[in-house]
Design a protein with these regions (language model features):
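Bacterial N-terminal signal peptides
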Residues: 2-14
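An anionic, turn-rich surface loop/hairpin at beta-sheet edges
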Residues: 95-117
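Short, conserved beta-strand element in jelly-roll/cupin
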Residues: 73-94, 100-101
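Conserved metal-binding segment of the jelly-roll/cupin
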Residues: 114-134
Length: 149
């Protein structure tokens, strides 16, 4: 009897456990439609947001022109190239002439790599990075998450 009661209590508590939150899903068509729509207001670099919080960001990013060099202290990034090719520069020093807009920043002394469809890049927290020399449009999945210390 005690075993039956313990099993019954276990089943009742399992039945009361809330279900996990539903997953986030975007179809291929939704991603490309969102990129097309966001390109209207930001043609050089635009995104199809998948899910963004204070602790992580998941976006499909599309670049048609190089943007300025950047670093994200405290956040690690993974980029999976979906289409296009270009040069990704990492490391080195960010150079921005005094008075120049942030979008004009470049990297001096970094490592340059050609990236193309299928490539995956891990960018450590705070690492400087810059996509330059794009050969047409570069599209990639960006997963940025808070570094655990």
């Amino acid at each position: 009897v005690r075993t039956a009661i313990a099993v019954l209590i276990g089943l009742l508590s399992a039945a009361q456990t809330p279900a996990p939150a539903p997953s986030t899903y975007l179809s291929d068509g939704e991603v490309w439609a969102t990129l097309k729509e966001t390109a209207k207001t930001a043609p050089d670099m635009h995104t199809a947001p998948v899910k963004n919080t204070d602790h992580y960001r998941i976006n499909v990013v599309q670049r048609t022109k190089p943007q300025g060099a950047i670093a994200h202290p405290g956040f690690i990034e993974v980029h999976h190239i979906i289409e296009g090719t270009g040069t990704l520069v990492t490391g080195g020093s960010i150079i921005r002439p005094e008075g120049a807009p942030a979008g004009s920043a470049t990297i001096d002394g970094g490592v340059s790599r050609r990236v193309a469809k299928g490539d995956v890049v891990l960018i450590p927290a705070g690492a400087r990075h810059w996509y330059k020399d794009l050969e047409g449009t570069l599209t990639y999945l960006e997963v940025r998450f808070e570094e655990v210390k």
